[in-house]
Amino acid sequence: MRTEIEIPDEVTATMDHLEVTVEGPNGSVTRRLWYPDITVDVEDGAVVIETDDDNAKTRSTVGTFESHVTNMFHGVTEGWEYSMEVFYSHFPMQVSVEGGDIVIENFLGEKAPRKTPVRGDTSVEVDGEELTVSGPSIEDVGQTAADIEQLTRVSDKDTRVFQDGVYITETPDRGDV
């Protein structure tokens, strides 16, 4: 089984041992792709994934690797973006980016600020009560958005009443990726 993924024009892909590095206008993404009896290589303007095995697990792993590579191409060309929104009813919370951390102050009237790190090459922009999380790596962008959402999770309270928090309102469109 052999699968070829064509490298877009403005993108370069290199293979270093087991790691694929993809560079483009939005940055670079590196990912380790390894599975027994599957080889990944860059040949003639394409990323080639091939194997001699024909069992279900190997075929599904080849498909997974293909998805990872196409997500990397999409990330370095168009990028990935999550939209988030701040909701509060009584205590106005302030969200800011300080260094490599997202800081949420005055959540439910708390005195101590809540912090979470920004992962990888992800950028977070705060515009009033709207946040935009974007970057070239879908894993880093998604995990940063999830970390922000979990940072304001309210435990031991009825979430129908205590709806304060920062929530993901729009996820990336994975249409033809």
Curated annotation (Swiss-Prot):
Cysteine pairs forming cystine bridges in this chain are: none
GO molecular function terms here?
A: rRNA binding; structural constituent of ribosome
Q: Which UniProt keywords apply?
A: Ribonucleoprotein, Ribosomal protein, RNA-binding, rRNA-binding
Kindly list the GO CC terms recorded for this protein: cytosolic large ribosomal subunit
Biological process (GO) annotations?
cytoplasmic translation
| Gene3D superfamilies in alphabetical order | Ribosomal protein L6, alpha-beta domain
Assembly description: Part of the 50S ribosomal subunit.
* Family statement drawn from the similarity comment of this UniProt entry: Belongs to the universal ribosomal protein uL6 family.
For this protein, the record's PANTHER family field holds: 60S RIBOSOMAL PROTEIN L9, 60S/50S RIBOSOMAL PROTEIN L6/L9
Q: Which HAMAP family match?
A: Ribosomal_uL6_A (MF_01365_A)
Chain's role: This protein binds to the 23S rRNA, and is important in its secondary structure. It is located near the subunit interface in the base of the L7/L12 stalk, and near the tRNA binding site of the peptidyltransferase center.
Q: What's the name of the protein?
A: Large ribosomal subunit protein uL6
Name the source organism: Natronomonas pharaonis (strain ATCC 35678 / DSM 2160 / CIP 103997 / JCM 8858 / NBRC 14720 / NCIMB 2260 / Gabara) (Halobacterium pharaonis)
